[in-house]
UniProtKB/Swiss-Prot annotation:
Keyword set includes Isomerase: no
PANTHER family: ASPARTOACYLASE, SUCCINYLGLUTAMATE DESUCCINYLASE
Family: Belongs to the AspA/AstE family. Succinylglutamate desuccinylase subfamily.
Organism field: Pseudomonas savastanoi pv. phaseolicola (strain 1448A / Race 6) (Pseudomonas syringae pv. phaseolicola (strain 1448A / Race 6))
Reaction catalysed by this enzyme: N-succinyl-L-glutamate + H2O = L-glutamate + succinate
Entry function: Transforms N(2)-succinylglutamate into succinate and glutamate.
Active site residues of this protein: E215
Binding site for Zn(2+): H59, E62, H151
Descriptive protein name: Succinylglutamate desuccinylase
Any single GO BP term: arginine catabolic process to succinate
EC id: 3.5.1.96
GO terms assigned for molecular function: hydrolase activity, acting on ester bonds; succinylglutamate desuccinylase activity; zinc ion binding
Annotated gene: astE
Cofactor note: Binds 1 zinc ion per subunit.
Root EC class: hydrolase
Length: 335
């Protein structure tokens, strides 16, 4: 197998490859673009016009998606997987991956769409670097741009695998893309309705890609992801990579759709959630329930019918989102 097929090993060891560019037996060019970054380019005669960005490890302890990308890269390097798409593989936060932690100083996935310019430190620089890598990759005109940013969650979830679909003024969410997510094993999609500072929001908003954050189960250490079923996602990614994706059924009846009702923002150190520490994502909330409290008598009271909570995290820094209140929605507004 080609040495560049061992991108994960190189990244975890903090080493550069001796050869920055290698060709597979199929004539596929693999090019090391920097730490944790590998571009894969098929021969021109096989290129089908798709640019696929696959990122994982934005949070260093979310290992199941990192292992999935490692398997795909190795399959390409061996010649088992024969790309017709251009692909950029990114391991988002190598320092945190090496430490087995979510981040070192700052959450990289809160530093996109201009936020890194307001901050400092190694992780702000990494967010800037990831933006530049993505912008360069998606710079070719007249191509189909797709980005999946793969994650696992801090906590358990009543819906184990789900996606977050970014928002941009004047742009509709795509029914076809939702059908693709359903085929890839996602059971629910959160349709966002305001700008965001995560990686997929940057590529969606600034680079014109169809972009998604995929949550694939609970975060576990390397080698302990046997309970995370990524087979449907892996199959769909292999089909996209090889240009053999079956026709998609745009019937979305089996896909649960949600929209954002409100974001819960932590203002001060006095912030508290009135939730059990082990509360799961998508847990239902009764109308009138006092969800959270902060200094000065500030309270978050559930006003919405059918409300649920996702990503509750009272440990975030002041000024950041500590959770999201979501409500069911339908496919009526889709493009």
């Amino acid at each position: 197998m080609l040495a560049l097929g061992k991108l994960l090993e190189l990244t975890l060891a903090g080493r550069e490859p001796a050869e920055k560019t290698q060709l597979t037996v199929e004539g596929v060019r693999m090019r090391w673009m920097g730490e944790g970054a590998l571009e894969v380019r098929p021969p021109q005669v096989r290129d089908n016009g798709t640019d696929l960005l696959l990122s994982a490890g934005i949070h260093g302890n979310e290992t199941a998606p990192i292992e999935l990308l490692d398997e795909l890269i190795r399959s390409i390097a061996r010649g088992d997987l024969k790309p017709r798409a251009r692909i950029l593989f990114l391991f988002g936060n190598p320092d945190a991956m090496r430490r087995g932690t979510r981040f070192v100083e700052q959450d990289v996935n809160r530093l996109f769409n201009g936020r890194h310019e307001q901050s400092g430190g190694a992780e702000a620089l990494r967010a800037c670097e990831l933006e530049h890598l993505a912008a360069s990759f998606f710079s070719l005109p007249d191509r189909y741009r797709l980005h999946y940013d793969l994650h696992t969650a801090i906590r358990g979830s009543k819906i184990e695998q789900f996606a977050l679909y970014p928002w941009k003024e004047g742009r509709q969410h795509s029914r076809l893309e939702l059908a693709r997510l359903r085929a890839a094993g996602m059971s629910a999609v959160l349709l966002q309705n305001k700008p965001s500072i995560v990686f997929s929001a940057y590529t969606y908003d600034q680079l014109g890609a169809e972009a998604f954050t995929l949550e694939l189960g609970k975060a576990r250490p390397f080698g302990q992801n046997q309970q995370v079923n990524l087979a449907p996602l892996r199959l769909r990614l292999e089909q996209i990579i090889e240009g053999r994706e079956p026709e998609l059924d745009e019937n979305l009846e089996e896909l649960q759709l949600f929209s954002v009702a409100r974001e819960v923002i932590k203002r001060t150190d006095a912030f508290t959630f009135n939730l059990a520490d082990a509360v799961e994502n998508f847990s239902p909330l009764e109308k009138g329930y006092v969800l959270a409290e902060d200094a000065g008598g500030s309270r978050w009271v559930v006003e919405e019918d059918g409300a649920r909570i996702i990503f509750p995290n009272p440990k975030v820094k002041n000024g950041l989102r500590a959770g999201i209140l979501i409500v069911p929605t339908d496919a009526g507004s889709l493009g």
